[in-house]
């Protein structure tokens, strides 16, 4: 089995308790790989009739499939270069469906590179509405632009700025926002040895500080009644529940609709955390405040 950081193992054991050994055993298994169909370019029925690869449906997304990279190489097929599908880690495909995207929505992907969430959002918008894909890293933004162009983006704007400047330009503008936050990358351990080497608990706390700033700015760009989905590919409570719980406590108009952890010993995927938050309108805020007063009396 791969060697994992001791502090990481201690923290996961506290979270999982009786499931800890099962989680550790999952690191003896191969990483999972997936592809997600671009339904703007090809229907699911037509794609499956091509029978190009040995595919298995991913249960949490209609457009996603598992594939075995030891048997097939979808990344080398011309359809990949044509933007008919996007290669994406399977558990990462659980995020965008939580947005409940409707045609015509104005959507923001705050931490967009390399484009997994943005390309998925585009296929859901189906050439309607607007997607703003933001990436603060000027190096990573090149890959984002290439992937969006390959996917056939026509209703998309790419921005390269921090969350504070973005918030000043788009206050209260978006129907839906996704924050796939920069994180310590613990969900990458099984597929990327460098992620293990780079991990420190200091990095966890550093990421937490950045995440808190991003979600605060993101929420201010959300319309009343809008949906914000926060996600990470890490397991630490500090970067997941702690960030969300503090944020909800600070914002009386924010309601946690659902949160979900995808663990590699429970699902076929590398692991993810997803939280769905709604911004209440003024009337709903008043109702919430009245209910809290009744509970406190």
Which role does the model predict for each range below?
Residues 1-297:
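S-adenosylmethionine
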